[in-house]
Curated annotation (Swiss-Prot):
Site (Arginine finger): R182
Location in or out of the cell: Membrane; Cytoplasmic vesicle, Clathrin-coated vesicle
Protein name per Swiss-Prot or TrEMBL: Receptor-mediated endocytosis protein 6
Region (Disordered): 547-610, 643-669
Length: 1093
C-alpha cells in the first residue's frame, strides 16, 4: 500500500514545491529552536559565572576573616555578623555602584590583569615589610583583579606576578635570600604564601603527597614522638617510674617510629611530584634560571637553597603541621595535641634533611638523619624541578608566561569586587612613586582619573529607608530591631544590655564595605603601551589631516541672482519678522558655518550679533530698493541672506513669530550638535556638508558634484544569478516559506492544459493557494509578504524560475551548516557550563573547609572564655557545665546513663548558643557545624571512658577478635564459599577504596563521625557494585557479602568497641533513613564474621 501511495505522489507536479516548502519550514523551526536554546544557554552560563565569581569572592573574604581572627585583628564577637553579611551579599552591575567611573575602572583592572610584570614592579615599590598592609594589598589583588585564581588564566597571571616579584626582591637581597623567605614579612614572600595556600592544584598535590602519612600518624594514637631525648625520657619516667630499665627500649621505639614516618613521607612526596602544579614548578624554575646567571658564586649557592626552601620549608612542612588547613584530611578527624606534636616533629626532621647540605644539623638530629633511608629524595626532587627537562605542561606555561606563545587558557568574563576593594586599590597605586616606565606611568595616569575615594551610588534598601522614616515612632523602631536581633533568643534576654556595645563594634563592617559589583572583562579591550601609542598617534594624524582639509576647502564664489520687481521692504518694522517667518517656514537647513565664521560670531557677543543682523538686513533692503530684480520665490531671498554671512534667527523673546516655531524644541534642552560632532567620523562630516544653494535651487556646478558610476539594473537576464532581483527574491522566498505553518491542498488537475504549464505557472498556483489560506486566517502581514514574492517572481522568465528553485535547494545545505555551527556553539556552552559547575564545587569545598576552621576556632573561644560574660571574672556557665560533665562522666557505669548525660549537656550548650547575641547571625550550616564541634570537643576529653566502658575487658576482646580476623585475612579471597559474593561482582575485588575508608574508623571520636565513616564505606561499595551490574543501586544481597570481605581485609583495631560506641551514642540517627540502612548491613556483616571464625 505504501508503494502505491508513493507512486501516485511521484506523479504530482506540485510535489517539488511541497517538499521544498516543508524543508525550508523545518529548517526555520530547527534554526529558531537552536537559536532560542543557544540564547537561553548563554544567559544561563553568564548568570552562573557571575554566581561563581561571587562565591569565590565570598570564600576569599571568609579566608580573610579567618586570618584576622588568628592574628587577633578581629574580635570573635562580631565574626558571625560579618560572615552573615558576606554570605548575603549579591553582586550588581558596576555602574550601579561606581556610576560613570565604571569605564575607567574597567580600563584600570584590564591593564593590571594583563601586565603582571608592571604589577610586580608596583608592589615592589610600595613594600614596607609590614605584614598587615601587605596582606591587605594582596587580598585585594587576589580576589578583585585575579578572581582568586579560579580560571587557569587567572592562576597563570598570579604566578607571573609572584615570580617577577620574587625575582626583584631576591636579587636585591643577594646572600640573604633565605632570610627573606624565612621571615615571610616582605610582600613577595607574603604573596607566595597566599598563592600556595589558596590555589586548588596545590591542595591536590599536598593531598596526594601527605594524606597517607598524616593518617598513619593519627592512627598511632596517644604515643609521643620526641626528637629531644631529654624530653622523651621525662615523659617515660613520668608515666613509668617503675620501669626505668626499659627506657633505652622506649627511646629506640620512638626513634624507629619517627624514622619510619619520615621515610614514608619522603617517599610519598617524591611519588607525588608529577602532581606538582605546573605554575608552581615554573615559578621555581624561572627564578633559578633567571637569577643564577646574574649573581655571584655565594649568592648562586644561596639561590639553590632558597628554591629548595620554597618547596620544602614554605609549602610541604607547613602542610604537614596543619593538614586540615590545606585540605589534606577532613576536619571531621580530631587532631589532638599529641598528633599535632608528632606532626611537628616529623616536619622538623624533613626540613633539616633539606638544609643539611647548607647547614650542619644540631646534635639531636644526627641520630635520625643517619637512619633515614630516603634522605636523597629531596635532592633528586629539586634536580628534577631545576635542572632536568621540563614537563610538557610546564614548558607550555613557560612559553605563555614569557610571551613566546599566545594563551589559549580559559579565563573569566568579569571582575568581581567591592567598592571598598576599589578604594584600597586606588590608594595602593597612588602611594607608588612616580616613574619613567611607560607601563607604570599608564597605570598611574589611569588611576588618577578616578577619585581618591569612591562611594556607592546604589539606593539604600527598603529596610534602611523604613528605619529612617519619621512616620514610624521610636518605640516601633526599637521593637523591630530587638526582634530582628533576637530571632533565636527565645525567653532569655540576659544579653540585651550588651546590644548597644555589640552594635557599636559592628559599625566597622557597615554595608558600604560590601557593595559588591561585577564588571565585564574582555581581553580584546586590552592594548599594550606600544599599540596604544600607535593608535593615539594615528588618531592625532587623522585629526590634523581633517583640520588641514577644512582650511584648504575652497569657498564657492557668490553669484548674482536676478530679482524681479516685486520688492519686499526690509527696512520696515516687520522686515525682521517676515524674514524669520520665511526662514522658519522651510525645511531646508542652512550650511554649517566654518570655523572662521564661528570665531567671528563668537567675538561679536550678543549685542554685536544683533547689530550685525540689522546692518546686513538694512544693506540687503537698500540693494533691493535700488532696482535689484526680485524673485517670486523664497529661495532667492535666502540666497541673498546666505551670501551676506548671516542667517536670521528668532528674537530672544519668548513670543514665537510663526506657528511652526511653537513646535521647535528648546536649544538648551536638546542635543548639542557641537558635542555630537566630536564623536562623528571625518567621513560622515564630509558627507553631511552639501552646499545650501544646491539644496535650494536643485542645481550644482559640474566641478563640485562627484561623477557617479552608472548603477547595474535591478533585473538582468544576462547576469541573472548576480542581479539584485534574484538575490532579493531568493531571500524573500526563504523568509516567507519558513514562516508558513500550513500548505495548500490543490486537488484539481486540468490534464488538457497541464502539459503546457511550466514551473513558473505551477509556482504561482502554489503560492495562490498559500495566499488564500493566509487571507482566510486573517494573517494580513504574511499575506502582504506573499504578494510581494509573487510580484518578484513575475520579473523572471520560465528558465529564471528554474534556476531560482535550484538555488532554493542549494540553500538547504547552507542552512544545515548554520545549524551545525549553532550546535557546536551549544556544545561549547555545555562544556563551559560543566566547567563552571566543577569550579563551583571547588569553591564550595574551599569555603566549607574555611567555615569548619572558623567555627572550630569560634567554638573553642565560646567554650573556653564565653561570649556573653566576656568582662566578668570567673568561669562562664558553659565552661562550668563542661567541667562538671568531665568530673561526673567517669563515675557513671551504665552506657545508657552516659548517653543521656551527654545528650543533656549538648542540649544545654545548644540553648546557650542560641541565646547568644552574636550567634543569632550565624547561618544554619554554621549552627550545625558548631554543635558538631561542641560534641567533638566535649567527647574528646572522655573518649577513653566512653569507648572502653569495661576498660581492660574491652581491650582484650578487641585484641582477640582482631588477631583472629588477621589470620583469616591472609587466606580469604572473593571466591570463598562462605562469603557467597555473587560472581558478577568479582571484577571489582578487592574493593581497596572501601577498605581505605573503613580503616579510618578508629581515628574518629564521635558516634556521628564513626557512623559517617561506615556510610562512606558502604557508598563506595554501592558505587562499585553499580559498575558491575545493571542495577543502579546494590541490593542487600550484593552489599552484605562484599562488606564482610572488606571488614576482614580492613580489620579495624577495635571493631566491637566501635559498634558498641555507635549503638550507645548515635541515638535516633541509626533508627531510620539511609544511615540506618547502611548501619544495619554493617552490623549484620560483623555478626556474620563472629559466627564464621
Amino acid at each position: 500500500m505504501a508503494d502505491i501511495i508513493e507512486r501516485i505522489r511521484s506523479q504530482d507536479e506540485y510535489r517539488e514545491f511541497y517538499e521544498l516548502a516543508t524543508k525550508i519550514r523545518n529548517q526555520k523551526l530547527l534554526t529558531d529552536a537552536e537559536l532560542h536554546s543557544l540564547n537561553r544557554h548563554q544567559q544561563e552560563v553568564s548568570d552562573n559565572e557571575i554566581k561563581l565569581l561571587t562565591e569565590a569572592w565570598r570564600s576569599s573574604y571568609w579566608n580573610n576573616v579567618g586570618r584576622q581572627l588568628k592574628n587577633q585583628a578581629l574580635e570573635p564577637t562580631i565574626a558571625c555578623r560579618l560572615l552573615k553579611e558576606i554570605s548575603e551579599t549579591e553582586a550588581l552591575p558596576a555602574y550601579k555602584h561606581v556610576g560613570h567611573h565604571f569605564s575607567t575602572l574597567d580600563q584600570l583592572l584590564t591593564i593590571l590583569y594583563n601586565e603582571p610584570q608592571s604589577v610586580a614592579e608596583l608592589l615592589n615599590s610600595i613594600d614596607r615589610n609590614d605584614i598587615t598592609s601587605n596582606d591587605s594589598t594582596i587580598q585585594v589583588l587576589f580576589h578583585l583583579v585575579y578572581s582568586c585564581a579560579l580560571y587557569p588564566e587567572d592562576e597563570l597571571k598570579i604566578a607571573q606576578v609572584v615570580c617577577n616579584l620574587l625575582k626583584l626582591q631576591l636579587y636585591r637581597s643577594g646572600s640573604e635570600m633565605r632570610t627573606i623567605l624565612r621571615k615571610e614579612t616582605s610582600i613577595s614572600t607574603r604573596f607566595y604564601k597566599h598563592f600556595v595556600e589558596l590555589i586548588h592544584p596545590t591542595m591536590v598535590y599536598l593531598t596526594k603527597a601527605l594524606r597517607k602519612g598524616v593518617l598513619d600518624v593519627i592512627q598511632l594514637g596517644s604515643f609521643w614522638l620526641d626528637i629531644d631525648a631529654k624530653q622523651s625520657t621525662a615523659r617515660f619516667l613520668r608515666d613509668n617510674k617503675q620501669n626505668e630499665d626499659r627506657l633505652p627500649e622506649y627511646r629506640a621505639l620512638v626513634v624507629s617510629k619517627l624514622v619510619d614516618f619520615v621515610d614514608t613521607f619522603l617517599e610519598n612526596i617524591s611519588k607525588a611530584l608529577p602532581m606538582l602544579p605546573p605554575n608552581l614548578n615554573w615559578i621555581i624554575r624561572d627564578i633559578f634560571c633567571s637569577l643564577y646567571e646574574v649573581v655571584d658564586d655565594v649568592s648562586a649557592i644561596e639561590l639553590s637553597h632558597a628554591c629548595k626552601d620554597m618547596i620544602v620549608s614554605n609549602l610541604i612542612c607547613p602542610a604537614i603541621i596543619s593538614p586540615q588547613k590545606f585540605g589534606v584530611v577532613d576536619n571531621d578527624v580530631r587532631v589532638g595535641t599529641i598528633v599535632n606534636h608528632n606532626l611537628v616533629q616529623i616536619a622538623m626532621i624533613i626540613q633539616m634533611i633539606s638544609l643539611r647540605e647548607f647547614e650542619s644539623p644540631p646534635e639531636e638530629y644526627k641520630e635520625f638523619l643517619s637512619q633515614c633511608r630516603n634522605t636523597h629524595l629531596i635532592s633528586e626532587m629539586m634536580d628534577a624541578l631545576l635542572v632536568e627537562k621540563l614537563a610538557p605542561d610546564v614548558e607550555i606555561t613557560s612559553l605563555i608566561a614569557n610571551g613566546t606563545a599566545e594563551s589559549d587558557m580559559a579565563t573569566k568574563s568579569s571582575f568581581v569586587g567591592t567598592v571598598a576593594d576599589v578604594n584600597v586599590l586606588i590608594k595602593i597605586i597612588r602611594n607608588a612613586p612616580s616613574t619613567s616606565d611607560a607601563k607604570l606611568s599608564r597605570i598611574l595616569s589611569v588611576c588618577d582619573k578616578l577619585p581618591a575615594t569612591i562611594s556607592s551610588t546604589t539606593q539604600k534598601s527598603h529596610f534602611d529607608n523604613l528605619e529612617a522614616s519619621p512616620k514610624i515612632s521610636t518605640l516601633r523602631n526599637i521593637h523591630r530591631k530587638v526582634q530582628h536581633s533576637f530571632k533565636r533568643t527565645g525567653d532569655s534576654f540576659n544579653d540585651i544590655n550588651e546590644l548597644g556595645a555589640k552594635q557599636g563594634e559592628a559599625l566597622a563592617f557597615g554595608k558600604e564595605n560590601f557593595d559588591l559589583f561585577y564588571l565585564e572583562y574582555s581581553p580584546k579591550n586590552y592594548k599594550d603601551v606600544a599599540e596604544a601609542d600607535r593608535l593615539k598617534k594615528k588618531a592625532e594624524e587623522r585629526r590634523q589631516l581633517a583640520d588641514l582639509e577644512k582650511l584648504l576647502e575652497p569657498t564657492p564664489a557668490p553669484k548674482e541672482t536676478p530679482v524681479e520687481n516685486n520688492l519686499i521692504d526690509f527696512s520696515s518694522g516687520s522686515a525682521e519678522t517676515n524674514s524669520e517667518h520665511l526662514s522658519d517656514s522651510t525645511s531646508v537647513s542652512p550650511e554649517p558655518l566654518t570655523s572662521t565664521e564661528e570665531l567671528q560670531i563668537g567675538d561679536q557677543g550678543v549685542g554685536g550679533e544683533q547689530r550685525g543682523k540689522l546692518a546686513k538686513l538694512k544693506s540687503l533692503s537698500d540693494r533691493m530698493k535700488k532696482g535689484i530684480t526680485q524673485s517670486n520665490t523664497l529661495s532667492d531671498i535666502r540666497e541673498h541672506l546666505r551670501r551676506s554671512g548671516s542667517f536670521v534667527k528668532p528674537p530672544p523673546s519668548g513670543i514665537p513669530t510663526s506657528s511652526s516655531e511653537q513646535n521647535l524644541p528648546d536649544v538648551a534642552t536638546g542635543p548639542r550638535d557641537d558635542i555630537l560632532a566630536k564623536y562623528a567620523s571625518i567621513s560622515s562630516i564630509k558627507e553631511q556638508k552639501p552646499a545650501l544653494g544646491n539644496l535650494i535651487d536643485g542645481t550644482a556646478s559640474a566641478s563640485s558634484t562627484p561623477r557617479k558610476e552608472p548603477l547595474e539594473p535591478y533585473y538582468s537576464s544576462e547576469n541573472l544569478v548576480g542581479c539584485r532581483a534574484f538575490q532579493d527574491t531568493l531571500r524573500k522566498m526563504i523568509t516567507v516559506l519558513g514562516n508558513i505553518s500550513y500548505l495548500p491542498r490543490i486537488g484539481y488537475r486540468n490534464e488538457t492544459k497541464q502539459n503546457e504549464w511550466d514551473k513558473k505557472v505551477l509556482l504561482g498556483r502554489f503560492l495562490d493557494g498559500v495566499l488564500v489560506e493566509t487571507e482566510h486566517r486573517r494573517e494580513y502581514g504574511l499575506a502582504a509578504q506573499l504578494r510581494e514574492v509573487k510580484r518578484c517572481i513575475e520579473l523572471f522568465e520560465h528558465a529564471g524560475v528554474e534556476i531560482l528553485m535550484d538555488h532554493l535547494k542549494l540553500n538547504e545545505a547552507e542552512q544545515d551548516k548554520i545549524v551545525n555551527g549553532m550546535r557546536e556553539e551549544r556544545a561549547s556552552l555545555m562544556r563551559k557550563s560543566n566547567d563552571i559547575s566543577s569550579l563551583e564545587q571547588r569553591v564550595l569545598l574551599n569555603r566549607r573547609l574555611t567555615e569548619q576552621i572558623l567555627v572550630d576556632f569560634l567554638m573553642r573561644t565560646f567554650l573556653e572564655t564565653g561570649f556573653n560574660n566576656k568582662h566578668t571574672v570567673g568561669k562562664t556557665q558553659e565552661v562550668t557545665a563542661v567541667l562538671k560533665f568531665y568530673d561526673e562522666f567517669k563515675y557513671l557505669r551504665a552506657q545508657d546513663e552516659r548517653a543521656e548525660f551527654l545528650k543533656n549537656l549538648l542540649t544545654f550548650l545548644r540553648d546557650r548558643l542560641m541565646q547568644n547575641v552574636d550567634w543569632n547571625f550565624a547561618t544554619d550550616t554554621m549552627m550545625s557545624r558548631a554543635m558538631t564541634t561542641i560534641e567533638r570537643y566535649v567527647i574528646f576529653a572522655v573518649y577513653d571512658n566512653a569507648f572502653y566502658p569495661n576498660r581492660d575487658a574491652d581491650h582484650h576482646r578487641d585484641k582477640l577478635l582482631r588477631g583472629t580476623i588477621a589470620k583469616v585475612s591472609d587466606v580469604v579471597t572473593p571466591v570463598n564459599d562462605f562469603l557467597k559474593i555473587p560472581e558478577h561482582l568479582h571484577g571489582e575485588a578487592p574493593w581497596p577504596s572501601a577498605q581505605a575508608e573503613l580503616s579510618m574508623l578508629d581515628i574518629y571520636v564521635t558516634a556521628q563521625d564513626k557512623l559517617n565513616c561506615v556510610v562512606r564505606c558502604c557508598d563506595v561499595i554501592n558505587n562499585l557494585v553499580a559498575l558491575s551490574s545493571k542495577n543502579a543501586v546494590a541490593s542487600a544481597d550484593d552489599l552484605t557479602p562484599v562488606l564482610v570481605f572488606v571488614i576482614i581485609k580492613a580489620n579495624p583495631r577495635a571493631l566491637l568497641s566501635n559498634v558498641q560506641f555507635v549503638e550507645t551514642f548515635a541515638g535516633d540517627r541509626i533508627e531510620s533513613g539511609r544511615d540506618a540502612y547502611y548501619w544495619v548491613n554493617f552490623k549484620s556483616a560483623v555478626e556474620y564474621i563472629k559466627t564464621i571464625l
